[in-house]
Amino acid sequence: EMPLAVSLDGEWAFHYAENLTAPFSDWDTLTVPGFIQMQSLQKPGQPYGAPHYVNTQYPWDGHEKLHPGQIPQDYNPIGEYQRSFTLPESWASCYLRLNGADSAAAVWCNGVYIGYTEDTFTPAEFDMTAAVHPGENTLTVQVYRFSSGSWLEDQDFWRMSGLFRSVELFTKPEIHLEDVVVKQDFAPDFSSATVTFDCKVSGAGTISVVFDGEEQSAEVGEPAEYDSGVVFGKGEADPDVEEDVQDVSFTFTVEHPTLWSAEQPNLYETEIALLREGALVERTGLKVGLRRF
């Protein structure tokens, strides 16, 4: 396991306010990951509220008259989390990942505003490189119980808030796999399959993909060094100069593929490796099922 990430799970300093203009409570501690209200139930007087169940209604119905997109003003609790962390000496960059913040969150590092997210169940990432410094740093996350995104989360479930999934710091090495999309196509009689890996890579070096025992690789460099569509080995690199990310595609042919099904969930092992001057920098493993739906 490569030391590219540091978990921030555990005890965080925490205080609470009922809305943006209300005073915050005294500092307490809460556990991350975890819902604020579930931990409030374990404290005398339930100081941070309780879980709220609604099905076909919004939580603010009957309390405040709101139009879609507006958020409650009188009762919209804020939970502010804070903790310190030490930046690893070898890191040249520092990113924060909130894997789940219900329903919205704003982030500060060392008093510098970093960003905002509102999408409860989608991880959010923030670049904190410009705000961190060697040694101890202070991270603050404000979590809002309701946001404009809450209008889209009108499902039949318990309403709670907080950092309910893991929080972590991570760095990106000199060459990094930003994303990968797997596409597949089949012969009409399913006698063969074509599997394409569309990779987004930042930085310069070598990317290698091993699928079904076959290896393909491509050299990627700084985007300005190449023209779009240059082919290296068997991989095709298509630079994206604006985002400093290159698109690299690898295509494999599988004869007589073993298909995936619910009854027989066959999977093909895949490994994507990134190297810099011949040294392994990053490795990602995938399991790919072949199936046409």
Whereabouts are the PLM-identified features?
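Accessory beta-strand-rich segments of carbohydrate-active enzymes
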Residues: 15-17, 43, 51, 71-178, ...
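Short strand-edge motifs at loop-to-beta-strand transitions and within beta-strands
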Residues: 81-83, 122-126, 224-226, 246-252
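Short glycine/proline/serine/threonine-rich loop/turn segments at secondary-structure transition edges
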Residues: 92, 132-136, 254-267
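Beta-strand-rich binding/interaction modules
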Residues: 107-109, 192-235, 248
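Surface beta-strand/loop "capping" patches
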Residues: 174-203
